[in-house]
Amino acid sequence: SIFLAGPTPRDEKTKSWRTTACERLNKLGFDGIVYVPEYSTWKPKANYIDQAMWEREALIESTVIMFWIPRSLPDMFAFTTNVEFGYWLHSGKVIYGRPDNAAKIKYLDWLYKMDYNKVPINNLEELLKESMILADKLYDEKNTEILPLSKRKILERK
């Protein structure tokens, strides 16, 4: 399963990147579960706690957490995404990408490089393909519990 993490539009005028991601996953033949943390039709949050709990459970259950961060100001701030990225980075199931023109993204790029020795993928379709590969790889090893900080995977810096 893949959780599509990243900014969510805050109004109905802003197009969601997740629609495109789901269409492409379908075309690529992904047959797993895709967790999409937004409503199928735009509407304001009815209950923040219910939404946050649903997302937390889906993040825990997902095999891969794919962060696509097309941050643009003032349309998609992605403040919550920053927290989620930091929280889940060492879970061993994060893959990260963003378009080259994403705003205020240098720190996330730096963390990903330092902790995974990887650069973010700058193309959504490529990120989706790599997410599918990672999901296949991790599926049998999947741990459905949040790892304590002492057991989170931190790659050795070179």
Where are these regions (language model features)?
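Conserved catalytic or regulatory cores that recognize and/or transform ribose-phosphate-containing ligands
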Residues: 1-158
